[in-house]
C-alpha cells in the first residue's frame, strides 16, 4: 500500500521555467539504482550545484533560497517532465520532499508516473499559474492547501479548481499503487489458481 493522499498544505517554491525535462530533474548519471530512495540528493543536480560532486550549492537557484527550504509544493511552467521516460524523475521529486507539482501541462509519461508514485500533478490554466507565480513571488514563504477530495487549490483568499480522472483520484485517495490494486483481488486470484489444471501449477 502506498501513502494515502487526501489533502496537503505545504510551502510553495516557484520554478519559473518551461519544458523542464527529466534529465534536468534527475540527470542520467544518477540512474544506476532501481530502488526509489536516495534520488532527492540529486534532484535538479546541474542547476542546484556548481560542481560535479554536488558539494557547492548554486546560490542563484531557487531551491537553494533559504525562504523555500522544506518546500513540498513545486510551482512550474508548461510541459513539465518532458524528455526521456524515466520513473526516476518522480522518485527524485518525492524523495526530496515534494508532494504536489502545479503546472499548466505535463508530459504524458511523467504525468502517469507521478500517480504511480503518489506525487500529485495538478493542471491549471496558464493564466491561473501566472497568478500563482505572482502571488508566491510577492509572498515568499507562502503555503498552498491542495485538497484532492474537493479537487481545489487554496492560495491566500483564492480557490482554483482542478480535475483528476476518477480512477487515478480513487487510487491516490486510498493509497493504491499497482500492487495494492492487485492485492484487492487476491481472493479472486487465489480462486482462479486453485481451479487451474494440475499440469499448469
UniProtKB/Swiss-Prot annotation:
BP terms from Gene Ontology: L-leucine biosynthetic process
Enzyme class: lyase
InterPro entries for the chain: 3-IsopropMal_deHydase_ssu, Aconitase/3IPM_dehydase_swvl, AconitaseA/IPMdHydase_ssu_swvl, IPMI_Swivel, LeuD
GO cellular component: 3-isopropylmalate dehydratase complex
Reactions the enzyme catalyzes: (2R,3S)-3-isopropylmalate = (2S)-2-isopropylmalate
4Fe-4S is among the record's keywords: no
Enzyme Commission number: 4.2.1.33
Keyword check for Amino-acid biosynthesis: yes
Keywords per UniProt: Amino-acid biosynthesis, Branched-chain amino acid biosynthesis, Leucine biosynthesis, Lyase
Molecular function terms, GO-annotated: 3-isopropylmalate dehydratase activity
Coiled coil spans: none
Gene3D superfamilies, A to Z: Aconitase, domain 4
Pathway the protein acts in: Amino-acid biosynthesis; L-leucine biosynthesis; L-leucine from 3-methyl-2-oxobutanoate: step 2/4
PANTHER family attached to this UniProt entry: 3-ISOPROPYLMALATE DEHYDRATASE SMALL SUBUNIT (PTHR43345:SF5), 3-ISOPROPYLMALATE DEHYDRATASE SMALL SUBUNIT 2-RELATED-RELATED (PTHR43345)
Complexes and interactors: Heterodimer of LeuC and LeuD.
Family, similarity comment: Belongs to the LeuD family. LeuD type 1 subfamily.
The protein's role, per its UniProt record: Catalyzes the isomerization between 2-isopropylmalate and 3-isopropylmalate, via the formation of 2-isopropylmaleate.
Name by which UniProt lists this protein: 3-isopropylmalate dehydratase small subunit
Amino acid at each position: 500500500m502506498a501513502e494515502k493522499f487526501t489533502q496537503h498544505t505545504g510551502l510553495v517554491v516557484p520554478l519559473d521555467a518551461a519544458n523542464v525535462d527529466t534529465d534536468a530533474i534527475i540527470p542520467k548519471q544518477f540512474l544506476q539504482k532501481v530502488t526509489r530512495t536516495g534520488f532527492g540528493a540529486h534532484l535538479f543536480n546541474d542547476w542546484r550545484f556548481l560542481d560535479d560532486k554536488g558539494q557547492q550549492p548554486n546560490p542563484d537557484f531557487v531551491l537553494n533560497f533559504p525562504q523555500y527550504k522544506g518546500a513540498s509544493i513545486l510551482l512550474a511552467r508548461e510541459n513539465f517532465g518532458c524528455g526521456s521516460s524515466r520513473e526516476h524523475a518522480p522518485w527524485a521529486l518525492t524523495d526530496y520532499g515534494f508532494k504536489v507539482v502545479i503546472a499548466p501541462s505535463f508530459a504524458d509519461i511523467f504525468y502517469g508516473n507521478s500517480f504511480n508514485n503518489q506525487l500529485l500533478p495538478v493542471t491549471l490554466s496558464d493564466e491561473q499559474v501566472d497568478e500563482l507565480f505572482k502571488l508566491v513571488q510577492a509572498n515568499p514563504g507562502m503555503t498552498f492547501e491542495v485538497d484532492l477530495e474537493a479537487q481545489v487549490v487554496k492560495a491566500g483568499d483564492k480557490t482554483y479548481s482542478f480535475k483528476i480522472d476518477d480512477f487515478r483520484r480513487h487510487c491516490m485517495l486510498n493509497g493504491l499503487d499497482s500492487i495494492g490494486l492487485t492485492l484487492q483481488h487476491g481472493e479472486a486470484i487465489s480462486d482462479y489458481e486453485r481451479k487451474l489444471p494440475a499440469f499448469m501449477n
